[in-house]
Amino acid sequence: MAKIIGIDLGTTNSCVSVMEGGEPVVIPNAEGSRTTPSVVSFQANGERLIGQVAKRQAITNPEKTIISIKRYMGTDHKVNIDSTEYTPQQISAMVLQKLKADAEAYLGEKVTQAVITVPAYFNDSQRQATKDAGKIAGLEVLRIINEPTAASLAYGLDKMDTNEKILVYDLGGGTFDVSILELGDGVFEVKATNGDTKLGGDDFDQKLIDYIAETFKAENGIDLRNDKMAIQRLKEAAEKAKIELSSATQTNINLPFITADATGPKHIDMNLTRAKFNELTHDLVQRTLEPIKKSLEGSGYAMSDIDKIIMVGGSTRIPAVQDAVKDFTGKELSKGVNPDEVVAMGAAIQAGVLTGEVKDVLLLDVTPLTLGIETFGGVSTTLIEKNTTIPTRKSQVFSTAADGQTSVEIHVVQGERSMAADNKTLGRFTLSGIAPAPRGIPQIEVTFDIDANGIVNVSAKDKGTGKEANITITASTNLTDDEIEKAVNEAKKFEAEDKKRKESIEVKNNADQIVYQTEKTLTDLGDKVSAEDKAQIEEKVKAVKDVKEGEDLEAIKKATEDLTQTFYGISSKIYQQANPEGAQGAGFDPNNMGGANAGNASAENDKKDDNVVDADYKVEDDK
C-alpha cells in the first residue's frame, strides 16, 4: 500500500512525517534538516527556491521572497511577483511540493496522499484554502486535522492504557491554539478549543524589530523600516536574538553597514537582555492566557482536573512563555515531546489510522467556532455550537419574514457574535420556489453538516413544496474549480522546470568532473600515453567543453560518455602494457575518481548518520 504522509504546514517552518514500523518518523529534507522553512523565493532567471535556500537569500532579494503566507490563508490576499499574482494557496502549494518531493526521495516511491494539519481555530475558509493548496501540490488531502489534536496523538500513542486529561498549548510562528482533550482506552476526545490565528513567533520578532528600529532612529534620525533590505536584516537579527535569549540572559545584535547617509555608513551594535525582551513582549504572552481560560470553561473542567500540559510549537521555548503558563496553571509543563516535530508526527499517526496501520485509536475532534444563519433583524441564529464534536449534522425549521415571500437567501456565518454582520460570512445561497403564503406559515428546514475535516455543507428545504437548495461552503476567498485546475497545471509546470533545471546542473557538474579528472590523470600519466592516444582524448575533452555550456543535455551526456569510454579503453591498454603477464588491471573510470559516485558514497555515509540527531528538548517518561 502506498504511504500517506503527515504534514505540519507551519507559518515559519513545516515538517513531514510518515509511519514506519508502527511509529511516526520525521523525514529529513534534501538539505538534511528535519524542518523546512515555509519560505518561497523567485529568482531573476525564473527559478524558484523553497525552504532554507530561499530563506538564506532573503536579505538580497526581499521583494521576491515570501514568508509567513499561512497568515493569509482564507483571505483574498495576493502576492505580485513580476506582474503575476499568486494566491496564498499557490504559495503554500510550493512549500507542500518541496515536502512531497523530500518524502518521495526518502521513501523511494511516489506520494499522492496526505494528512495536513491546521490551527484548531482556523475557520472554514482557511481549512478549504489548505485543502486547495494540497490539491495544487498534487496531493489528495485525506484529512485536515487540528494541530493540538495531532500533538496529542503523538504524545498519547504509547499511553493507550492511561486515562488523562491534557491541555495542549500550541504557540507556533504565526498562530496560537489551546485544546483540552481526554485520553483513555485509545480514544482521543477533544473537549474544547480556543485560540488566536494572528498570534505567534512572528509577532515576538516584530516587537524586537520595532525596538531596534526605534532605537536606531532616535540615535541616527533614519527609519530602517523604509528600507526593504535593511528590514530583512533586522528580521533575521531579531529571530536570532529571540532564539539566543531562550538559553542566554543577554545577546549582542551586530549589523554592520545597515545603511548610510551623507556622514558615511551606519552600523548597529547593541546588547539586548532577556529582561528587556520579556518587557517588550509581555502583552503577547498575556494574550495567550485568556484562551486557556476560555477552553477550560468550554470543556467544563477545572484546572485541577488537568493531568498534563503539553507545550507545542517553537515559540514555547521562550522562557517567559513557559513561566507564564506555569504561573497561570499552577502546574509543571510536560517536555516529553519535540515542539517542532510533534504535530507532523501526529498527522502521520492519523494517516496510519486511515490506512489501518494504527489500530484501536479513535479521534473525536470539535468545531472551533459557532455556526449559524442570519435571521430577521440581522441576528445570528445558532445551529451548531462551538466545541461540538465532529462530524455532526443539525437541522432547524425557519419561516418567511414577509407575506407572499417566494424565496429566501440563506446567509451562513461563523463566529461568536450575536449579530450576523459581526461574524465571518462563509457563504450565501438562495432557496426559490416557495409557495406564496402569509409570513410565518412556510416551513423551511435548514441543515448544517460538518465533516471530519471541519468543512461545512448547508442545505435548505421547503417542507411544503419539497424544493431544495444546498451548497458546500466556498467563500469568495476560496478558489473555484477552474482556478484550482489552472493552479495545478502551473504547479506541474514549475515542478517540471525545477526537475529539468536540477537535471541540467547535475549533468553539467558531471561533465565538469569528468573533464577535470581526465585532464589531471592525463598529466599524471605523462609519456605513458602515446601521442596518438593523447590527441584522441584531447579531441573528446574539447567535444565535452564545446557542448557543456549549452542546454542540449543529451549532447552533453553523449559527449561525456564518449570521453569516458575512450579514456577507459586507453587506460586499460596502459595497464596491460605495464603488466604483460596478462593480469587485468582495474582500469580507469573517471566516474570513480572522486566524481559523482564518490558523492553518492558520501551521501550513503550521511544517510547512515541520519539517526544521530541533535535534540534540544527534554525527554521525560510521562507514563
Swiss-Prot record:
Cleaved signal peptide residues? none
The modified positions for Phosphothreonine read T175
Which CDD domains does the entry mention?
ASKHA_NBD_HSP70_DnaK-like
Give the induction note. Answer: By stress conditions e.g. heat shock.
Which family is this sequence assigned to?
Belongs to the heat shock protein 70 family.
Q: Where is the composition biased (Low complexity)?
A: 591-603
**Summary of the function given for this chain in its UniProt record:** Acts as a chaperone.
Annotated spans, Disordered: 580-623
Question: Where is composition skewed (Basic and acidic residues) in this entry?
Answer: 604-623
The protein's name is Chaperone protein DnaK
UniProt KW ATP-binding keyword: yes
Q: Which HAMAP family match?
A: DnaK
Kindly state which keywords UniProt assigns to this record, in alphabetical order: ATP-binding, Chaperone, Nucleotide-binding, Phosphoprotein, Stress response
From the UniProt record, report the name of the gene that encodes this protein: dnaK
PANTHER family per UniProt: HEAT SHOCK PROTEIN 70KDA (PTHR19375)
Instruction: List the InterPro entries.
Output: ATPase_NBD, Chaperone_DnaK, Heat_shock_70_CS, HSP70_C_sf, HSP70_peptide-bd_sf, Hsp_70_fam
Q: What GO terms are given for molecular function?
A: ATP binding; ATP-dependent protein folding chaperone; unfolded protein binding
Source organism superkingdom: Bacteria
Q: What is the lineage of its organism?
A: Bacteria, Bacillati, Bacillota, Clostridia, Eubacteriales
